[in-house]
Design a protein with these regions (language model features):
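Cross-family detector of peptidyl-prolyl cis-trans isomerase
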Residues: 2-325
């Protein structure tokens, strides 16, 4: 599954209705479905952006030029449905980026899949403009973000963008995912690593003393009620992974803020074999503890951005937030 086009990826290094207009759907107090944006509230600049065309198709965007802001603003162009996004939530989205000074398109997605972009509302996330703009967004909505130069492109010069230029982002938010597993608690099994979580869902894993395990074990810590994953599913998840012998975290979604969700392709041979086996057939909304013996703590390495310890069992705690489809 493609997550970004080449053009959007290059830019990121630096940084159901038709004829939809740019009229904001914010209520008088600025809230959306009971959520009030604070990182990038609506303003005159974002309210001046219009985007015509059906959701999930490339929009025709217009606004008065030059458009410049010192603080990033967000307005809702098309209302969505469901719960408004808050800290730690994630979303797929289609994206068009324009130069606020010239009105010219800088980058645009393909609008032919679940979404070219994927992001989490988390402090320290790379795409600051989008991270701020997603606050309070809903699925199947369209939002306009007018970003200052820091949030939009980190004050860098790129493809005709000047250091002080503001950028305009039009996002079609396709699918949203919660910050953590929402299932019902299950009683822990004796002899397995113990798990405690913070309010944000970040797990702490305590490895028990005693014999190092040689068999594969999985335990539900929370049981979800959503659809089951399949062998070729793309699973949206947050996780922490620890080596049994040195009790050290070697991979985690919580390297920043409220944790950054990742998309795990279960059909990808680059995924650790035991992680893939443990996730197949699990319900969305579940939190899963996996103890993976060394013989299953392997992959072909093609999808690894971290170094996986060898010769030791691995322990994963995984929140299954959704399935990309």
């Amino acid at each position: 599954m493609r997550k970004t086009t080449a053009l959007l990826a290059a830019f990121a290094i630096l940084a159901g209705l038709t004829a939809c207009t740019g009229t904001s759907t914010l209520v008088k107090d600025g809230s959306i479905a009971g959520c009030t944006p604070t990182a990038a509230p609506a303003g005159a600049a974002s309210g001046s952006v219009t985007a015509t065309g059906a959701l999930r198709t490339a929009p025709k965007v217009s606004f008065p030029t030059p458009l410049h802001v010192t603080k990033t603003q967000t307005s809702v162009l098309v209302s969505g449905k469901g719960r408004a996004m808050t800290a730690g939530d994630s979303a797929f989205y289609d994206l068009t980026i324009l130069n606020g000074r010239t009105g010219k398109v800088v980058a645009q997605g393909t609008y032919d899949s679940i979404g070219d972009g994927f992001g989490t509302i988390a402090k320290g996330a790379a795409f600051e403009a989008v991270t701020k703009g997603l606050e309070c967004a809903q699925g199947n909505s369209r939002i306009a973000i007018v970003a200052n130069s820091q949030d939009g492109h980190q004050n860098k010069v790129y493809q005709g963008i000047r250091k002080t230029d503001s950028l305009v982002f039009v996002l079609d938010v396709t699918t949203t995912f919660p910050a953590q597993a929402t299932g019902h608690n299950r009683a822990p099994q004796n002899g397995l690593p113990s798990v405690v979580t913070t309010k944000s869902g970040q797990p702490g894993i305590q490895i028990p003393a005693g014999t190092v395990p040689k068999t594969f074990t999985k335990q539900l810590l929370k049981e979800g009620t959503g659809p089951k994953t399949k062998k070729d599913s793309f699973v949206v998840a947050k996780y922490t992974a620890v080596g049994w012998r040195d009790k050290t975290v070697f991979d985690s979604s919580w390297t920043i803020g409220e944790g950054q969700a990742k998309v795990i392709g279960l059909g990808n041979p680059g995924v650790v074999a035991g992680l893939r086996a443990g996730l197949i057939g699990q319900k969305v909304g579940s939190r899963l503890l996996l103890v993976i013996p060394p013989k299953l703590a392997i992959s072909d390495g093609s999808d690894q951005t971290v170094t996986v310890p060898t010769g030791t069992p691995l322990v994963y705690v995984v929140d299954i937030l959704g399935i990309a489809q």
